[in-house]
Amino acid sequence: MSEDPQSWSKERKNCERVKRALMSQSPVIIFLKTALDRLNCNIEAKDISCQPCDAQSTGGYIPGKGIVLCENRLYTKKMAENTIAHEMIHMFDDHRFEVDWNNLRHQACSEIRASSMSGECRWTKELRFGNIKTFRKHHQECVKRRATISVQGNPNCKSKEQAEAIVEEVFNSCFNDFRPFEKIY
């Protein structure tokens, strides 16, 4: 797509505007940016690319390249914030722990952490989308569900059952690792 802002789609213009606002105004994004800076991994708005996507994804982290926001899948500013936070947690993990993204356990751990800490499993969001089946330990169930879906997308994953087993295997240690946060609410 052309880099001339005049030729950008309405979705691209909105994505660019929202991403720039979040990078300078969102407390969680600013906190994660600072944590990444401490790892000598500087990220600016220009390192987050707005692109149209075909899949059901709202974004992605590409090791060594940066973050992609799916301009045609972001419907609210909060959704964009959750997506950027999720991908920044992957970036943090990649730089802090040298994640091997082909290793399903490594990916599952990062997905668990990102789903738990990004806000995408907030109770209010889950309620709005009809995903609340029980109030007890719902956050954990949401994190497991979302991590399983992501691991299933890895070409090295053979089945949903394998993804579920791997997520379950690493869940406790990864779910209880809040770095760079002290805790989650």
Curated annotation (Swiss-Prot):
One BP annotation, GO: mitochondrial proton-transporting ATP synthase complex assembly
Topology relative to the membrane: Peripheral membrane protein
Disulfide bonds: none
Compartments it resides in: Mitochondrion inner membrane
InterPro entries: Peptidase_M76_ATP23
Function recorded in the entry: Has a dual role in the assembly of mitochondrial ATPase. Acts as a protease that removes N-terminal residues of mitochondrial ATPase CF(0) subunit 6 at the intermembrane space side. Also involved in the correct assembly of the membrane-embedded ATPase CF(0) particle, probably mediating association of subunit 6 with the subunit 9 ring.
Family stated for the protein in its record: Belongs to the peptidase M76 family.
Record-given protein name: Mitochondrial inner membrane protease atp23
Species: Schizosaccharomyces pombe (strain 972 / ATCC 24843) (Fission yeast)
